[in-house]
């Protein structure tokens, strides 16, 4: 087979979520080396390293001929690479190989959840162009959330049960388990304002969160638009329905208790200040400014057969 690319760089963290990262590296390099004349394997020892390597690739200090990037890891590792590519304006395609708890965006790209299978899919995958979310000076592929979803992310980081991933089994006990905090919000979306009290606000680019599909048929990370959802205190009974369903459905069936507002530019303030979950990483607090950057990033995509 003819090599598609001159020089690929495969990034990974030692604590990627795979039980044996070195074995995992070996399993994916067979396929990746078949499409790259030269494949560099780059360990990221500390948070922020991948962003530094992206800067070196941009300035040609890393190598002069890098023309594709691969990442083996979970959503947090992928998020770091997205930030590196966007911050340093690297116009290079990215191949994502799942290696963590959740890889929500790989589902959007039709990539297999197993890293070895995913690497084999890279051989025939095509480059697709996708929107990116900008949050203050950070970037994300999939979602921005606060309230209940932050509490969930903190549970996962502590090694506790992943509430969102297990919602289908929890049902009506969600409210008791989580004891969610109400907060006041002021939201501006494309110059229209909204305010009130809520337990969770979610702005989504991709259709999968926590391993399940958001039941909104036309939600796409290629439409130049973001989708914001405001949950009210009566929403708990249908949270289960939303995250349990595996297929898209008519939003009108579950619209009670959830307000859905599409838009491109969003400003959000809360009282009190709230932590913000960006693709599973909690790194900001409100107030935040959010906008969609259309056609911002190139990702290897498996054709949906």
Swiss-Prot record:
According to the entry, every stretch annotated as the DAGKc domain falls at: 3-139
What domain of life is recorded for the organism?
Bacteria
The similarity annotation says: Belongs to the diacylglycerol/lipid kinase family.
> What broad class of enzyme is this?
transferase
Task: Specify which residues bind Mg(2+) according to the UniProt entry for this protein.
Answer: 220, 223, 225
This chain's protein is named Putative lipid kinase NWMN_0695
Which cellular component appears as one GO term in the record? plasma membrane
Q: Which cysteines are joined by disulfide bonds?
A: none
Q: What does this protein do?
A: May catalyze the ATP-dependent phosphorylation of lipids other than diacylglycerol (DAG).
Q: What's in the keyword line of the UniProt record?
A: ATP-binding, Kinase, Lipid biosynthesis, Lipid metabolism, Magnesium, Metal-binding, Nucleotide-binding, Phospholipid biosynthesis, Phospholipid metabolism, Transferase
Catalytic activity, EC:
2.7.1.-
Q: How is the cofactor bound?
A: Binds 1 Mg(2+) ion per subunit. This ion appears to have a structural role and is required for catalytic activity.
Q: Name one GO biological process term.
A: phospholipid biosynthetic process
Q: Which InterPro entries match?
A: ATP-NAD_kinase_N, Diacylglycerol/lipid_kinase, Diacylglycerol_kinase_cat_dom, Lipid_Phosphate_FormReg, NAD/diacylglycerol_kinase_sf, YegS/DAGK_C
User: Does the keyword field hold Transit peptide?
Assistant: no
The answer on whether this UniProt entry bears the keyword Mitochondrion reads: no
Record's signal peptide? none
The record places the active site at: 281
């Amino acid at each position: 087979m003819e090599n598609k690319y001159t020089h690929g760089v495969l990034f990974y963290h030692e604590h990627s979520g795979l039980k044996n990262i070195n074995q995992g590296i070996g399993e994916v390099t067979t396929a990746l080396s078949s499409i790259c004349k030269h494949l560099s394997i780059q360990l990221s020892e500390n948070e922020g390293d991948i962003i530094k390597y992206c800067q070196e690739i941009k300035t040609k200090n890393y190598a002069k001929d890098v023309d594709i990037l691969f990442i083996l890891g979970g959503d947090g590792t992928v998020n770091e690479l997205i930030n590196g590519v966007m911050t340093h304006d690297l116009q290079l395609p990215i191949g994502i190989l799942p290696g963590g708890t959740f890889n929500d965006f790989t589902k959007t790209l039709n990539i297999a959840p197993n890293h070895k299978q995913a690497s084999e899919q890279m051989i025939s995958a095509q480059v697709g162009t996708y929107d990116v979310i900008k949050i203050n000076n950070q970037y994300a592929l999939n979602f921005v959330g606060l309230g209940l979803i932050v509490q969930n992310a903190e549970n996962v980081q502590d090694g506790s049960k992943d509430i969102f991933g297990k919602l289908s089994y929890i049902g009506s006990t969600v409210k008791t388990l989580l004891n969610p905090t109400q907060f006041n919000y002021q939201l501006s979306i494309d110059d229209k304002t909204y305010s009130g009290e809520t337990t969770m606000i979610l702005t989504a680019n991709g259709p999968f969160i926590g391993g399940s599909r958001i039941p909104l048929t036309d939600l796409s990370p290629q439409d130049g638009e973001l989708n914001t959802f405001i949950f009210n205190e009566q929403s708990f009974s249908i949270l289960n329905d939303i995250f349990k369903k595996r297929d898209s459905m008519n939003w009108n069936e579950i619209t009670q208790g959830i307000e859905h507002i599409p838009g491109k530019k969003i400003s959000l303030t809360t009282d009190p200040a709230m932590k913000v979950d960006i693709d599973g990483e909690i790194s900001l607090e409100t107030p935040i400014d959010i906008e969609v950057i259309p056609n911002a990033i190139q990702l290897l995509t498996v054709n949906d057969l």
